[in-house]
Amino acid sequence: MLFRSSLEAAVFQLLKEKGLTLGCAESCTGGLIAKRMTDLSGVSAVFRGGVVSYATEVKHTVLGVEQALLDEFGAVSEPVARAMAEGARRVLGCDLAVASTGVAGPDPDERGNPVGLVYLALAAPDGTWVRKIQQGLGRERVRHVSASHAFDLTRRYLSGLEVK
């Protein structure tokens, strides 16, 4: 059972208070954002679902990320994170959508992006914001820290704080 003070619990409470829904598109977090949301009882009132778009072609075919964007910038990039969040918002029919794309490790990706480089995006009716993080080594640590950053990004938006 999660503590009520967890980031995901705070996001859940804020979504309920504001009557908004959330979805997610995950790559490097591999479904961890969705898992942490669905660990909370009653979350079906606000959580629409998620897409684990681990493969690049899924980012294109399911989320609608333009192939030209993937070719130019690669899957681990700010423009792709932005497009993933916007695609998830559209596909899942939710008010807000958060996305993660990055390099969990143990090796750099094919473009040479280092382990621990992650882009998180939040798409909302009034805009899309991206946060770039670079964190310590360890696949599990990268996944868990990235999911927490995704919840923090969402919490900040819902709380009316600066989203960065």
Residues of each region from the PLM?
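Short alpha-helical segments enriched in small residues
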Residues: F3-K164
